[in-house]
Amino acid sequence: MAFKKNLASSKDDNISDWYTEVISKGNLIHYSNIKGFMSFLPNGWKIWQLIKKELTKEFDQRDILELCLPSLISQNDFLLEKKHLEGFAPELFIVTKTSNETEKYILRPTSEIAFCNLWRETLRNYRQLPIKHNQWTSVFRVEKNTRPFLRNSEFFWHEIHSCFETEEQSNDFAVDIWKLYQRFIKDILCIPLVAGEKTEAEKFAGAKTTYTVETIMPDGQALQSATSHNLSQNFSKAFDIRYQTKNNDYQNVFSMSAGVSTRIIGAIIMTHGDDDGLVFPTKVAPYHISLNCIFDDTNQELNAKLKELANKYSQKYRVHLNVNKDSTGEIIKNSQLRGDCCVLLMGPNDLKKNEIVFIDRITKQKQFINLDHLDQKLEELFSTFDQKLYQKAKAVFETKVDFAQTFEEFEQKIASGKFVRVFYCNEDLYEKQIKEKTGASSRCIIKYLDEQTQERCFISNKKAKVEIYFARSY
């Protein structure tokens, strides 16, 4: 007998409708009356705060200092470095009038310019280097086709901006942060990934090198989930950021930037959610345990016991206590929609038997657990929960990754929703043709081939220079 699912939409049949429904019924956000803007509801914001907590631990170990910079950028400053911010021009929010001032201002689409202005005015000599800064903030980019978390006109992120004495130091730190992102996405968020370098056509225009982390959604589309950029001296020369060296001469700094945004919440939802609702890895789940009274919410002894359990387990887990008179079915449904890792139910008869009903989010199987064994049961659940999530996601991931030798194969596999690995000559001309013909873009270079390679490019038949992934993307 098939049980009715909590959602009307099926993730397998129509992931777009499913995504819209699961976000709404999971109470993560509220749509604003301004296109592309949304309010984070408490559970949605809690996820972002938990992501922030995990990443901040890593940043603190690297002596990255947190600060906060202004939201407005002078349009004159923006035009000064327009070529390095290419791609933002058509999607800017511009403040056209401020009191009697004639100069226009831009709501930041990113903060390289703000950091450059700060460093130019405060950096004096080599003793201040390296500078490692980070801010948690929102940025603004006009979007025509918006989806909550995946594509918003205002979104939240963290952005690291750092500067160094040498190119090697700048690149090494960019790579270190890139590897940190890979560990975070794989080990904490339980999402399989592909990592590599962006092509010249796809990298951040102001970067010498862009390192990316790409995740693959269940429909085969790629989601750029984190990037780290070696900016070399591109910004420091444009903004004249110089410091006095040990030799008493002056040199431009080398800089890098990196970031992860609330888009990663969309990746978590699409990777782990199911037709009953949201599912979250333990480190970022708003609630680990939903603890509920059933059948008799006026029973003082029962309520006292539930509060005792809530106080006990709140020392280790995030607990949602519910002593309202909801039906058992409604309690389980709401817990699954919300993405609680497990739901615990206790009624008067359970109290007499010294037991509790236990349902975990992954298996959804109902078990009766003696309260004397509940500690052990929870330990067992949370010691394997993330591993099970990752293995489930990895199984889907492996069905979406494929290889193509020829362009004909490539077209077929892209059309069927695959994340396709190919050998490629790495020339911008062909990248544009590929996008026009298939809708796929290059996602990341995973390997540079040596001169002796016998591999041929899948589209030009020229000698291949790289091994690379292409996919359609969000």
From Swiss-Prot:
Reported function: Catalyzes the attachment of proline to tRNA(Pro) in a two-step reaction: proline is first activated by ATP to form Pro-AMP and then transferred to the acceptor end of tRNA(Pro).
PANTHER family: BIFUNCTIONAL GLUTAMATE_PROLINE--TRNA LIGASE (PTHR43382:SF2), PROLYL-TRNA SYNTHETASE (PTHR43382)
Subunit structure: Homodimer.
Compartment list: Cytoplasm
Reaction catalysis annotation: tRNA(Pro) + L-proline + ATP = L-prolyl-tRNA(Pro) + AMP + diphosphate
Name of the featured protein: Proline--tRNA ligase
Record CDD domains: ProRS_core_arch_euk (cd00778)
Domain topic, free-text comment: Consists of three domains: the N-terminal catalytic domain, the anticodon-binding domain and the C-terminal extension.
InterPro entries from the UniProt entry: aa-tRNA-synt_IIb (IPR002314), aa-tRNA-synth_II (IPR006195), aa-tRNA-synth_II/BPL/LPL (IPR045864), Anticodon-bd (IPR004154), Anticodon-bd_dom_sf (IPR036621), Pro-tRNA-ligase_IIa (IPR002316), Pro-tRNA-ligase_IIa_arc-type (IPR004499), Pro-tRNA_ligase_II_C (IPR016061)
Keyword Iron among record annotations: no
EC supergroup of this enzyme: ligase
Keyword list, A-Z: Aminoacyl-tRNA synthetase, ATP-binding, Cytoplasm, Ligase, Nucleotide-binding, Protein biosynthesis
Pfam family, one: HGTP_anticodon
GO CC terms: aminoacyl-tRNA synthetase multienzyme complex; cytoplasm
Gene Ontology terms describing biological process: prolyl-tRNA aminoacylation
Keyword rRNA-binding: no
EC number: 6.1.1.15
GO MF terms held by the record: ATP binding; proline-tRNA ligase activity
PROSITE patterns the UniProt entry points to: AA_TRNA_LIGASE_II
Native organism: Mycoplasmoides gallisepticum (strain R(low / passage 15 / clone 2))
Superkingdom of origin: Bacteria
Family the UniProt entry places it in: Belongs to the class-II aminoacyl-tRNA synthetase family. ProS type 3 subfamily.
